[in-house]
């Protein structure tokens, strides 16, 4: 018995067995098989700006917001505007799997647990043994624009967005409006590693 992958190679199975009403297929050689997980690769640093050129500002005491900020102010607040973007190897093809973190004394990583955006005090994990995580977002290029969007791996169809709430522009997680929703589009300006 064999199973075909997308590349045309196959996996030969030597045995099948039922354990607790679950069918297990035992391959002859599982050296080429990958488990469903995210494995951390390397990182880059960037400033994230909204479609209105506002800079993402992370203050651990408050929800992340977008602010009008000249470069001199952004540089003065670099620990709160410099995002550390860790890239992850993904066992599925869904976009570039990333985490977003800031280091202002201690490392904090963006989470969308329960669809609420917050930076949790933690280092991005080396490995995540699942295909979904509140920490992983799929960074994708927006067709026809020089912009990026970030889809939650945990909540399919939900994206990071810049949304006005009260008197502030906040970073939120929302379902993307398919009619040209620009609130989910961001500009990334890569910075030199420090």
From Swiss-Prot:
Any GO CC annotation of this UniProt entry: extracellular space
Keywords in alphabetical order: Cytokine, Cytoplasm, Inflammatory response, Secreted
Claim: Secreted is one of the keywords in the record: yes
Post-translational modification, as annotated: The pro-IL-18 precursor is processed by CASP1 to yield its mature, active form. The pro-IL-18 precursor is however not processed by Casp4/Casp11 in rodents. The pro-IL-18 precursor features autoinhibitory interactions between the propeptide and the post-cleavage-site region, preventing recognition by the IL18R1 receptor. Processing by CASP1 induces conformational changes to generate critical receptor-binding sites. The mature form is then secreted and released in the extracellular milieu by passing through the gasdermin-D (GSDMD) pore. In contrast, cleavage by CASP3 inactivates IL18.
GO MF annotations in UniProt: cytokine activity; interleukin-18 receptor binding; receptor ligand activity
A matching Pfam family: IL1
Domain of life per record: Eukaryota
Residues the record marks as site: Cleavage: 36-37, 71-72
Subcellular location: Cytoplasm, Cytosol; Secreted
Protein family membership: Belongs to the IL-1 family.
Described function: Pro-inflammatory cytokine primarily involved in epithelial barrier repair, polarized T-helper 1 (Th1) cell and natural killer (NK) cell immune responses. Upon binding to IL18R1 and IL18RAP, forms a signaling ternary complex which activates NF-kappa-B, triggering synthesis of inflammatory mediators. Synergizes with IL12/interleukin-12 to induce IFNG synthesis from T-helper 1 (Th1) cells and natural killer (NK) cells.
PANTHER family: INTERLEUKIN-1 FAMILY MEMBER (PTHR10078), INTERLEUKIN-18 (PTHR10078:SF35)
Quaternary organization: Forms a ternary complex with ligand-binding receptor subunit IL18R1 and signaling receptor subunit IL18RAP at the plasma membrane. Mature IL18 first binds to IL18R1 forming a low affinity binary complex, which then interacts with IL18RAP to form a high affinity ternary complex that signals inside the cell. Interacts with cargo receptor TMED10; the interaction mediates the translocation from the cytoplasm into the ERGIC (endoplasmic reticulum-Golgi intermediate compartment) and thereby secretion.
Protein name: Interleukin-18
Record lineage: Eukaryota, Metazoa, Chordata, Craniata, Vertebrata
Gene: Il18
